[in-house]
Amino acid sequence: MKTTMNFVFLFFLPLLINAKPKRVTLHIPLVHNGANFYDSKVVSLPLSSPHSQRGLAFMAEIHFGSPQKKQFLHMDTGSSLTWTQCFPCSDCYAQKIYPKYRPAASITYRDAMCEDSHPKSNPHFAFDPLTRICTYQQHYLDETNIKGTLAQEMITVDTHDGGFKRVHGVYFGCNTLSDGSYFTGTGILGLGVGKYSIIGEFGSKFSFCLGEISEPKASHNLILGDGANVQGHPTVINITEGHTIFQLESIIVGEEITLDDPVQVFVDTGSTLSHLSTNLYYKFVDAFDDLIGSRPLSYEPTLCYKADTIERLEKMDVGFKFDVGAELSVNIHNIFIQQGPPEIRCLAIQNNKESFSHVIIGVIAMQGYNVGYDLSAKTAYINKQDCDM
């Protein structure tokens, strides 16, 4: 009997040694800030400018440390670093909800080691071998800066079914400087690709689903891990400098307009509005002029009409078609938003006059869609659906 038990043990020992720990899947409910649609986003790398958060932001409530302390993080696919403001912070913006995080009060907090990154990388990481502390800094084109210490911490998330899940050793930035003044919440939940991105803690899959913004009871969610919703129409993505890049084949304004050459697209939940290169923006403008048959109130920085002009229009889709046929389209009554006086409606797509040929698709254009990512397969999936979990 003993010989048999030894044989069984020796047979399964290699399997036990090589077994990988099962990854956790996090189902995180999201809420949006219900903001007026003001968007001063400046095209930059990383794409998410903190000033864009004066507009619409989808937020995830995550508990940091032990004992747990709530943080309210803005979901951002345009940047890879997850961060929150830490105490003490001599030059940080004022938080309207939840006090600044105190790492000294958590028994699960620890400073993280890192490798020095390329001098021009953004964010930039630097490791001090004497203090054994990794510092980072991130600069935005609108002159906003953040600085702090890279750390690891236990996070706890309340799940949609009333339970909770914990994950240990998650990388995050502990800010000691945040000189922007327009942040929503306590920090950023960075869903870009990077060595210290939270995405790496859960494998290579994640998805987010955004319901209709105008519906108070609409659901919105984020799923991290193998249980992510990666169903729908596939499209190939490229991963460059931490960004997932889609290929735009055509635009839709009532009818499809095929582009002469594919255009690179960033699907960026850190931006409220969408931003087009000048040439592509005027393709949109010309198509609207022909379709609506009414002179707009303005062309720049975005197309604006009297509200009754838009309200008279029949249902019409405005959107984007990607490589392999995946499509993201929004009803025209959702893509035109109040901006300024109540009698004015403006297209939630702006002309980007920077020397930047990419397209940025913001969250207003993503209403009613689930976007799933399988980074290992370099594939994204776009599916129009209800976001109830």
From Swiss-Prot:
Glycans are attached at residue 238. This is Aspartyl protease UND. It is an enzyme of class 3 (hydrolase). Disruption phenotype: Premature apoptosis-like programmed cell death (PCD) in tapetum and pollen from developing anthers, leading to collapsed pollen grains. One of its GO terms (molecular function) is aspartic-type endopeptidase activity. GO terms for biological process: pollen development; proteolysis; regulation of programmed cell death. Probable aspartic protease activated by the transcription factor MYB80. May participate in the regulation of the timing of tapetal programmed cell death (PCD) which is critical for pollen development. Residues 58-383 form the Peptidase A1 domain. CDD domains: pepsin_A_like_plant. Plants silencing UND exhibit partial male sterility with reduced silique elongation and seed set. Premature apoptosis-like programmed cell death (PCD) in tapetum from developing anthers, leading to collapsed pollen grains.
